[in-house]
Swiss-Prot record:
Compartments (UniProt record): Cytoplasm
Family affiliation: Belongs to the VPS25 family.
GO biological process: protein transport to vacuole involved in ubiquitin-dependent protein catabolic process via the multivesicular body sorting pathway
Full protein name: Vacuolar protein-sorting-associated protein 25
GO molecular function: protein homodimerization activity; structural molecule activity
Record function comment: Component of the ESCRT-II complex (endosomal sorting complex required for transport II), which is required for multivesicular body (MVB) formation and sorting of endosomal cargo proteins into MVBs. The MVB pathway mediates delivery of transmembrane proteins into the lumen of the lysosome for degradation. The ESCRT-II complex is probably involved in the recruitment of the ESCRT-III complex.
Length: 174
């Protein structure tokens, strides 16, 4: 199933940030929702600023409109303020997009563990995000950095413990 673009995406003024404060806030909210929905649909976690600016997300070739780099940065800053984005490098060119925050991913993973009677079991990180048992689960294919943050959130709640097994990491659920 393809991504369903919101109506604003085909409205040329959407690609120019508006000067009116109220209008701009609504526009940034719409852009934030669009970015999170698009990343969720396409299972995107780690992204590059230049690549995303050229992607269909900010570049509608059908109406020949593209959000400027400066405006893309404003949208990304809005997402950062809401806790949905974190810069990976100092020059703000790569970022982690969090359409689910780590604690939310932790809950999803823990529900799967509980539902399948796997508490008191040890998993490698690979098994959780790439194993046959998790095929079809929403967290299958999750970025490893995001998985670790999710498991750290569960560790804070005493529901899991991250362990090192030889050269790889694993997790035990309680």
């Amino acid at each position: 199933m393809g991504f369903e673009w919101p109506w604003q995406y085909n409205f040329p003024p959407f690609f120019t940030l508006q000067p009116n404060v109220d209008t701009r806030q609504k526009q940034l909210s719409a852009w934030s929702s669009l970015v999170l929905s698009y990343c969720r649909q396409n299972k995107l976690y780690t992204m590059n600023l230049m690549e995303i600016q050229e992607s269909p997300l900010f570049n509608n070739k059908k109406i020949q409109r593209k959000l400027s780099l400066e405006s893309v940065q404003v949208v990304l800053e809005e997402l950062r303020k809401k806790g949905n984005l974190e810069w990976i490098d100092k020059n703000k060119s790569r970022f982690l997009i969090m359409w689910r925050r780590p604690d939310e991913w932790g809950k999803v993973i823990y529900q799967w563990v509980s539902k399948n009677g796997m508490t008191n079991s040890v998993f490698t990180l690979y098994e959780l995000i790439s194993g046959d048992d998790t095929e079809g689960e929403e967290f299958h294919g999750l970025d490893e950095a995001m998985l670790l943050r999710s498991l750290e959130a569960l560790q804070q709640e005493h529901k899991a413990e991250i362990i090192t097994l030889n050269e790889s990491r694993g997790v035990k659920f309680f």
